[in-house]
Amino acid sequence: YIGIKEIEIGFPSASETDYEICRELIEGGHIPDDVTIQVLVQAREHLIKKTFEAIRGAKHVILHFYNSTSTLQRKVVFHMDTDGITKIATDAADLIYEMAQPLIREGMDLRFEYSPESFMGTEMDYAVEICQAVLEHLHATPENKVILNLPTTVENCMPNQFADMLEYFCKKIPSRDSAIISLHPHNDRGCGVATAEMGLLAGAERVEATLFGNGERTGNVDIVTLAMNMYTQGIDPKLDFSNINK
């Protein structure tokens, strides 16, 4: 028992396997009452609708949606300008907010999370602009905060540069008090832990990590190393690694 209280269980709209895993966890009663599940979805209408089907019956859910915002992907993949990319995000936010209301009225604790994928490759002023637009379309308030998750994606800059970006972002976003700033560091340069630590110093409040750094390509930030490093600095990460060998 490590004590992790928010766990991403998959991408239920991406495959039938992920969908069935999500349903089994909910229907089989495998989720502790004090644990929030998180599900990932692209900012696409049919995938969002499938995701809402997958989470029915859950008690505590973070619905995490994303679209890419980098200069490269805007040009090469989407062939869109910034207005077009922002519309993808805000249309998704509108749909998610609308579909969430009946579930919230029925008692589901449902929170929202948005990631500008390839944040490192996005102009910071545009990253601020699109995230602020999403906050507004999700009706974020200081009492009902939205998680803004800032991924390193392919980690194409150094940890200190990422910290500078993050500090700038936190200072410039108008609705800072209505957002929880989250990090999602990958480890392509082998700097995932350093990036997370620098990001926390620069203003982040939350880190998405994996056990032992398991993840795509060279992995994600290792929550064990990150947490143990925090212990060495006198900070209690509120995680229990006493049985880590098992």
Where are these regions (language model features)?
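Catalytic cores and adjacent flexible loops of soluble metabolic enzymes
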Residues: 1-246
